[in-house]
């Protein structure tokens, strides 16, 4: 991970040592309103069914989620200024107990259209690269000025995401 950070909250059965709940995120360097900051994509949320009601309402999912939020979200050094994710079955519980908000109704953002005919310039060449270098950093530096909010897609991030991915080798 380009941030060098791990963001995981666990619930463990102390009698057996078994992990019974997990709330994790992918920390990201984010460009927001002209400033580099940290954010987190929420991923891999799970609680074993027999443990979901543990501790009464709001249940173990919300308890582990609160621990994650209290630990990683804030304005302190190294904290994420926001988190985001895709809807999960526990979305309503997250909305009620963890402050999840529906930012966008994604099914309104797409429509199938035929691909337009595009002209091809003889001045451009498209090639495959093994690794990203300073040229992609220059591209990102030029592009970020047009963006209000985006994951920083510089060479460090793109190499981690694609070139260094285990499935590439």
What are the functions of these language-model segments?
Residues 67-68, 75, 107, 113, ...:
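Residue-level detector of solvent-exposed, low-hydrophobicity positions
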Residues 96-156:
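Acyltransferase donor/substrate-recognition loop-hinge adjacent to the catalytic core
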Residues 13-16, 50-51, 113-115:
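Short loop segments at secondary-structure junctions
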Residues 1-45, 88, 129-169:
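A conserved beta-strand-loop-helix scaffold within acyl/acetyltransferase catalytic domains
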Residues 19-33, 74-76, 112-127:
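Hydrophobic transmembrane alpha-helix bundles
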Residues 31-105:
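Acyl-donor binding region in acyl/amide transferases
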């Amino acid at each position: 991970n380009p941030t060098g950070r791990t963001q995981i909250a666990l619930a463990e059965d102390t009698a057996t040592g078994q992990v019974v709940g997990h709330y994790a995120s992918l920390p990201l360097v984010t460009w927001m309103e002209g400033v580099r900051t940290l954010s987190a994509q929420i991923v891999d949320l799970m609680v074993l069914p027999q443990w979901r009601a543990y501790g009464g309402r709001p249940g173990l999912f919300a308890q582990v989620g609160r621990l994650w939020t209290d630990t990683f979200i804030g304005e302190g050094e190294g904290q994420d200024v926001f988190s985001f994710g895709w809807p999960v079955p526990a979305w309503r519980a997250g909305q009620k107990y963890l402050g999840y908000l529906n930012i966008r109704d994604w099914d309104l953002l797409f429509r199938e259209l035929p691909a337009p005919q595009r002209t091809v310039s003889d001045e451009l060449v498209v090639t495959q690269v093994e690794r990203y270098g300073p040229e992609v950093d220059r591209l990102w530096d030029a592009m970020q000025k047009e963006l209000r909010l985006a994951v920083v897609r510089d060479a460090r991030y793109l190499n981690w995401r694609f070139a260094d991915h285990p499935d590439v080798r």
